[in-house]
Amino acid sequence: MPLFFSDNLRAALECLLFVAGGPVSVDSLAACLGVKPGDVDELAAELQELYAREERGLQIRAVAGGYQMCTRPEFASYCEALLRPELPALSRAALETLAIIAYRQPVTRTEMEYIRGVKVDGVLNTLISRGLVQEVGRKEAPGRPILYGTTPKFLEFFGLKDLKELPPLEDVAASQENSREAGGRGSIPGHPGEE
């Protein structure tokens, strides 16, 4: 039996997402509300529709395998005027390395360095310490190098539901070929910080 009356479940979901401050898995929400995971998806869809219809400043988004309450992008400038980011923005080198990992994961440090044409040790350590990248295994190759991949925090950071929301790799590959023709080694173009 649900913890709340059925008429209040949508409001209860709204409260849970508000106090969470970040993405909450469907299973966690279902357990708190005493409903099935499919019911959470239906309640979230109702909230999404309500927020869109009433043109609220907030939205409910499917992010990293769950749901999150967040501000609508068109109101970002107001939020930025009020808040200062806790962490400095990612450098161009970090964004390039992160793009390589996102599109080619799992990927080794050596593969990243080949694509970028420079060492990535410092940048990789920064991405790991920020929780955007993690070790995901070992490559079946001599020396068994560490493989890296993105984390759920990466999805949250970029507001993605899953990696399928990244721009199609074909578009990136075409831009990469243009970069090679211009004399580059093939770093992943089409991402913030590209010149």
Curated annotation (Swiss-Prot):
Q: Where is it found, in Gene Ontology cellular component terms?
A: cytoplasm
Where can this protein be found?
Cytoplasm
Q: Which UniProt keywords apply?
A: Cell cycle, Cell division, Chromosome partition, Cytoplasm
Q: Give the InterPro entries listed for this entry.
A: ScpB_csome_segregation, WH-like_DNA-bd_sf, WH_DNA-bd_sf
Q: Which domain of life is it from?
A: Bacteria
**UniProt-listed NCBIfam families:** SMC-Scp complex subunit ScpB (TIGR00281)
**What does the subunit comment say?**
Homodimer. Homodimerization may be required to stabilize the binding of ScpA to the Smc head domains. Component of a cohesin-like complex composed of ScpA, ScpB and the Smc homodimer, in which ScpA and ScpB bind to the head domain of Smc. The presence of the three proteins is required for the association of the complex with DNA.
Known role: Participates in chromosomal partition during cell division. May act via the formation of a condensin-like complex containing Smc and ScpA that pull DNA away from mid-cell into both cell halves.
- Family assignment from sequence similarity: Belongs to the ScpB family.
**HAMAP family, A to Z:** ScpB
PANTHER family assigned: SEGREGATION AND CONDENSATION PROTEIN B
Annotated protein name in UniProt? Segregation and condensation protein B
Q: Which organism is it from?
A: Moorella thermoacetica (strain ATCC 39073 / JCM 9320)
